[in-house]
Amino acid sequence: MSPVDVWVGSWRPHKPRGPIAAMYNSPGPTYALPGATGMNNHDPRMQKGPAFSFGIRHHNFHGNYSPGPGYLVPSNITRVGRDGTPAYSVYGRRKDIQPFQTPGPGSYSPENATKATYLSPPAFTLSARTKLFRNDQTPGPAAYMLPPVLGPKVVNKTSAPNVSFSGRSAIGSFHEDLRKTPGPGTYQVVDPCVYKHKGPQYSMTGRNMMPGDMTKKPGPGAHYPEMVCFTRAKAPSFSFGIRHSEYVAPTIVDGED
């Protein structure tokens, strides 16, 4: 067989254009395994020897270690509350009531009472126009709407008698349109059961189902007994594997390997 017939198709081995990380061998995830020596991060699958350590120096004890303010409970407190002993306290001195502050002579202004005690001439002042005067718009003579005196519309005026002709009725006249007369189908026919005897009526209800398990159960056709291979012998079966890559890392089954 010639070397040309070894390869199938147009693919031939060639040098890759760039570096492939899988082509370089490395220890892989072996370094991520826990160590088998020492005390910290020891592999639990490995046997571990005895290890001894020295204790640490304790902190100096402080002289004052009180239980805190939670234990400062008054002595008159029992498990049901206070013991009921009367307690007294001294209040502060109340302030004196302030007396009435009588106004003195300087608080009055007698010079302003001249107009009330002595005769004085009349005095007039000009004030601004009030707001109501500006809004008071009196209607003129042309603004009144007097009712007319003709006809019976005025109550206090005498009026002559009025005669009017009524319109001609279209019903029963010679020009009545008989085509607009309603036919028999226009009226609503009353049900005969209203004024006659009505026979009995019966109806059939649906079938009532007894309460029970309503889940769907598989029938005989839902099972495949020919595919059962636990109760009888079965011929061996084989399958073809797949092509594995040479760059796949091996599976670690044991740390000792």
From Swiss-Prot:
Keywords: Cell projection, Cilium, Flagellum, Repeat
One GO term describing the cellular component: cytoskeleton
Encoding gene (name): cimap1b
PANTHER family per the UniProt record, alphabetical: BOREALIN N-TERMINAL DOMAIN-CONTAINING PROTEIN-RELATED, SHIPPO-1-RELATED
Cell location: Cell projection, Cilium, Flagellum
Protein name from the UniProt record: Ciliary microtubule associated protein 1B
Main location: other
Family indicated by similarity: Belongs to the CIMAP family.
STPGR repeats: 103-129, 182-207, 218-243
